[in-house]
């Protein structure tokens, strides 16, 4: 099989919130692509041997000379280029055109009118105007606009406020679009990107789950040989897919460590051990470390401190087990492509602000002295799920809602106690069970219960109760960067509330969180 990454499409990132979305759209076409900073060096670029380049949008303005520019040599590379929003503007300025800040800004939907014929947009339309012009509904997000074309370019589309909403130099296969084809609001956006990537760049469309698995297995076997690999198995999607992939590639050379922190979902430990140990035959070392974690968390209420303690304690437990295994040479991790991109961005961005520390960042201690194996580091989350299904993992496991690494520790808004964890575990399980029963689970992106450290008066029979409050949270999102609270049916919420209050000892009241992101985050801590 040919190397799937032999001639990738490159996306040069100017800081757009949509850059990863561009890459995901390209991958959906079966095309391998990678994201690099806009100032990629020439030698690295040549080694990658790309089939074409997309210049992303960004928050800066090209009217300031100090702001980011594409490498000038890029425009002499003879490769097809597509500039989106800021990418189009910097292309225009660097090739001799002009861009000015506009008082007529465009944010949101706009009607786009196509001009004549262009290879990029021909025969792509939402409807036709009275004069026969093709019209598209697109998503705009810009203040600056191109006011003068570079030499050799022509206008290929316009909006009411942007006479040059798209430009093309067909002879050099250079294109610019002021709108965002990568977002779903641009109805024909995927077709436009496909026209550039597949038809103009002639990109290979072999990036499929089957081929990804074949190439990953070959690479794992080549790297590892006959040596043994250690994996921390959590039961989450990423580590589960890594376990299944490694098991197929190297069989009994894989050893997994599963740490029960006492902060997992109801019956989660049993499910993981049954699925991977008994059914798949993977060697798993199970460690019940509940007491160790609860002792470490005693008296701690600060969310950030809880995260750090849970991460540190996990490393201690994992390290202790790893030291007992003398013949292990490799450590496998479930790093995925967004982790790689975000780590690179944070390392070069002095202005980055840590909202919450990530439990995976920092890794395991150097004393392990193991070589690192990251077999899914080039995959987005949706690709990880597709690979998981192809490897035979159950749909319910692969499409399970996200669960934070610190587990219930950051869903208990107080000191973490066993009593609180047991209450929350049962309440959460009822909520998830009823979502499945009502066929709502896969219609929302994430749902969970939160334990609130306040007591509320309730009435049971003839007696009064003074017990804890549970809050339910359900959100809908595409990328988890923003989210809407789910408008679940009132009768459904009433049923869940009734079950929790009646079946979970210690709960007298259930509430529902109707906060979006922003301003709230999805998790409470």
From Swiss-Prot:
Catalytic reaction list: XMP + L-glutamine + ATP + H2O = GMP + L-glutamate + AMP + diphosphate + 2 H(+)
Pfam family for this entry, one: NAD_synthase
CDD domains: GATase1_GMP_Synthase, GMP_synthase_C
Residue ranges occupied by any Glutamine amidotransferase type-1 domain in the UniProt entry: 8-206
GO CC annotations on file: cytosol
Active site: 85 (nucleophile), 180, 182
Binding annotation for ATP: 234-240
Xref: Gene3D superfamilies: 3.30.300.10, 3.40.50.880, HUPs
Oligomeric form and interacting partners: Homodimer.
GO MF assignments: ATP binding; GMP synthase activity
Organism of this sequence: Legionella pneumophila (strain Lens)
Record-linked InterPro entries: Class_I_gatase-like, GATASE, GMP_synth_C, GMP_synth_GATase, GMP_synthase, GMPS_ATP_PPase_dom, NAD/GMP_synthase, Rossmann-like_a/b/a_fold
Function recorded in the entry: Catalyzes the synthesis of GMP from XMP.
Pathways per UniProt: Purine metabolism; GMP biosynthesis; GMP from XMP (L-Gln route): step 1/1
UniProt cross-references to PROSITE patterns, sorted A to Z: GATASE_TYPE_1, GMPS_ATP_PPASE
Taxonomic lineage from the root: Bacteria, Pseudomonadati, Pseudomonadota, Gammaproteobacteria, Legionellales
EC class: ligase
Name of the featured protein: GMP synthase [glutamine-hydrolyzing]
Sequence ranges assigned to domain GMPS ATP-PPase in this UniProt record: 207-400
Keyword vocabulary terms for this entry: ATP-binding, Glutamine amidotransferase, GMP biosynthesis, Ligase, Nucleotide-binding, Purine biosynthesis
EC number: 6.3.5.2
